[in-house]
Amino acid sequence: MNDFQKYLSTAPVLLTLWMTFTAGFIIEVNRFFPDMLGLYF
């Protein structure tokens, strides 16, 4: 169990989880508020 916890705390695993969360968040924001990635002045 200690090795599994050490594996989950490594950088590639944390980076993958963070990028998955970020991509999902951006997708959901764009679903409810489309075309907000471009800034229109």
From Swiss-Prot:
InterPro entries: PSI_PsaJ, PSI_PsaJ_sf. May help in the organization of the PsaE and PsaF subunits. The chain crosses the membrane at residues 7-27. It comes from the Eukaryota. Keywords: Chloroplast, Membrane, Photosynthesis, Photosystem I, Plastid, Thylakoid, Transmembrane, Transmembrane helix. It is found in: Plastid, Chloroplast thylakoid membrane. The keyword Chloroplast applies. It is a single-pass membrane protein. This is Photosystem I reaction center subunit IX. One of its GO terms (cellular component) is chloroplast thylakoid membrane. Pfam families: PSI_PsaJ. Belongs to the PsaJ family.
